[in-house]
Amino acid sequence: MVSAIFRKIFGTKNDREIKKYVKRVKFINTLEPKYEAMNDEELKAAFNELRAKVKEGVLGLEEVLNDVFAVVREASKRVLKMRHFDVQLIGGMVLHEGRIAEMKTGEGKTLVATLPVVLNAMSGKGVHVVTVNDYLAKRDATQMGELYNFLGLSVDVVLSGVYDDSVRQAAYNADITYGTNSEFGFDYLRDNMKFDAKDKVQREHNFVIVDEVDSILIDEARTPLIISGPTNRTLDGYIKADEVAQKLTRGEAADPNVPNSKATGDFVVDEKNRTIMITEAGISKAEKLFGVENLYNLENAILSHHLDQALKAHNLFERDVHYVVKNNEVVIVDEFTGRLSEGRRFSEGLHQALEAKEKVKIQEESQTLADTTYQNYFRMYKKLAGMTGTAQTEATEFSQIYKLDVISIPTNVPVMRIDKNDLIYKTQAEKFKAVIDEIKRSHEKGQPVLVGTASIERSEVLHEMLVKAKIPHSVLNAKNHEKEAQIIADAGAKGAVTIATNMAGRGVDIRIDDEVRALGGLYIIGTERHESRRIDNQLRGRAGRQGDPGMSRFYLSLEDNLLRIFGSDRIKAIMDRLGIDEGESIESRMVTRAVENAQKKVESLHFEARKHLLEYDDVANEQRKTIYKYRDELLDKEYDMSEKIAQNRGEYVALLLDQAEIFHGGLKDDYDIKNLCALIFNDCGEEINESELKGLEYDEILAKLTEILAKRYDEKMSVLEPTQKRDIEKVLYLQVLDNAWREHLYQMDILKTGIGLRGYNQKDPLIEYKKESYNLFVELVSRLKSESVKMLQMVRLRSREEQERETAAMLERMQEQQDEGLKFNQREGEDAPAVREKKIPRNSPCPCGSGKKYKDCCGKSGPKKGILA
């Protein structure tokens, strides 16, 4: 009550923020006549003068903001024939301050972005503008590029499929770079797999504006960016697990309100949390079918994992809802955009389980070579901002995860769209009949209708019903996306009927003419509520742009997934009380609120899932940053490795003494020097005379052995120029580092897969994950030190000319393996396509130059079996 009175007197927090911006907008407006009076050359000169002062540090961005915004507005009037509205100036200031600007559909977000983009590009440190697809990135870079070029700023775009380093470098070196979230993220990962600093394409992460920020930072947050390579694991387990899963019977969960109630059947599905629980009866049955005594023994861990994924594939994932089968492949359907996610695969074996279910070719599992999340990638920028039409529903998450405020920007013209209360029916059949009747009424009077569906399957059901009703219409879904722009552009024509999945929620504006305005504008019909209120709001937002009339209404049924799983009991009770007959519906604000509460429940669950993912990735992210920082040091031509090599050599010798059971304080007569010398020879090919070490104390052996190895190494390297020596050391160190990091990521994957089971032992899985991942990282560092010393000691040099050729060839081979042998894949919190790497024949000379066969040298120290496997 008190807060309501406070808001009435002082306005909301958003209102108070807007008032501050309005004062500044008034001042910017006073500058308009000054810049209008200038000719083109004078306007450019005024901008360049401001730009020079910013670059020299004489003026800060805040000090030049008013003039720069006024200049950009004037330049836009001349070049683009568009003048920034006052509310667009407010949006520009919000973005410049590193906040999220929530702007309704049709309010010109693309034009708004030009203001902070130009302002921040003046520093010369680069500005990135992120869009949801290549088409929008190219379109915006081309259209807005005319304005940027007029002001002397360079603009470029990074597109998928164009991976030439020189092309990418040119794009990132431009003042302004457009591209998609996945391309920016993958370029970051690719850069940290390069063997020469000059091949890196990205520069510092200065300022980024994310268009459709809710889609990228919220919806895509559960999608890790992963570069992956092949594994040698067999695929037979997926087929067997699929056969077993189909023989198990689905049951009901135990009723918490009934004492001693037990779950029935072989397994229980929790649709709310999207999990499967196998009952005792199910475990016994599965063990018989697999022919094992204990399904949950360590040696059967892979079997139980395959079975879990097979049960998920059959009971939680629907064809034409969560995925489609296209060209004999399982392709994911993005639940938020409705588009096909080509090249993306579910991980942890789920995609293979779906392939087994659909009887298509099962592709190999993959191993992580490099990964990050969008949360951690975008948090690297010094300043992050975003814009979207729908952000307030996720304001808490933006604040907690990204430290971003959401500011709702007033519309330039009041919204005239009428949003009607939901209509709720008992069954889906009744609901769809009512939808068809409503479409028919609107079509007969000429009012265009856009019908939103939550899945491909539902869009095709409606399509068949409209065909029977003889109502002409267009269908837009992931199976028919090629004509998307044309279908959406025509959706506002008189009498048009368009059925669309969530694809219609963003991107292209639907324009209407005066005749359609007189008929009430575009009519939006939603056939069910999405789990996220934002997706519903995006659908509604297709109507009523820039003050146009329009109308929206959602038709629901108690059989819809959202109501069935999360909230129908209360609504069903109301319908029963009111005695609703077949074909009748409820329309009340109370029911609409109940539906929104169900959506809030789901949003809360998803938020917790994303937060959970981030908590785990934050652990890995600290390790990732440490490794990448060290990698950058190695790539620095001025970095001298001599001290690091000497330190590692001493630690390596101490490790060898431990392995030979030569301990500090032991009796020197008991030391097995012969065994120690054999270990050294097997490890790094160095022959040590036993007599040099016999009769010495522990400290003396440590010092003597370190001295011998150092002396031999220095003698070997003395024939090289200092720069050659440094290059060889760095190349070998990078090779060891990348192999060790790759193996570490594999072990981290295994750890993450099984860590949830610790909860059954009354232990917090996250705390356990932090402890064990730290131990794995300590092992990684130790392995890195010892393996690097081994590699350096094993190097056998030829003549200087031969060595130069060998070093150059080796660098080229290593980079080829990264560039050609890898595929860059996103995977959805869950596997990426199998990747082919160039393989060195086992009996070929080792590329490190040791003179040994590959199988006896680096091939022997390749990825080992994970410690938790």
UniProtKB/Swiss-Prot annotation:
Where is the sequence biased in composition, kind Basic and acidic residues? Answer: 818-840
Q: Could you name the Gene Ontology cellular component terms for this entry?
A: cell envelope Sec protein transport complex; cytosol; plasma membrane
| Bilayer topology annotation | Peripheral membrane protein
Which stretches of sequence are listed as region Disordered? 818-869
Gene Ontology molecular function, alphabetical: ATP binding; metal ion binding; protein-exporting ATPase activity
Its EC top class is translocase
Kindly state which reaction or reactions the protein catalyses.
ATP + H2O + cellular proteinSide 1 = ADP + phosphate + cellular proteinSide 2
Q: Which domain of life is it from?
A: Bacteria
Q: Where along this sequence does the record place binding of Zn(2+)? A: C846, C848, C857, C858
What subcellular locations does the record give? Cell inner membrane; Cytoplasm
Give any Pfam family that matches. SecA_DEAD
Keyword Protein transport applies? yes
**Which HAMAP family does the record associate with it?**
SecA
Record NCBIfam families? PRK09200.1 (NF006630), PRK12904.1 (NF009538), secA (TIGR00963)
* Function in brief: Part of the Sec protein translocase complex. Interacts with the SecYEG preprotein conducting channel. Has a central role in coupling the hydrolysis of ATP to the transfer of proteins into and across the cell membrane, serving as an ATP-driven molecular motor driving the stepwise translocation of polypeptide chains across the membrane.
What name does the UniProt record give this protein? Protein translocase subunit SecA
Species annotation: Campylobacter curvus (strain 525.92)
Gene name, please? secA
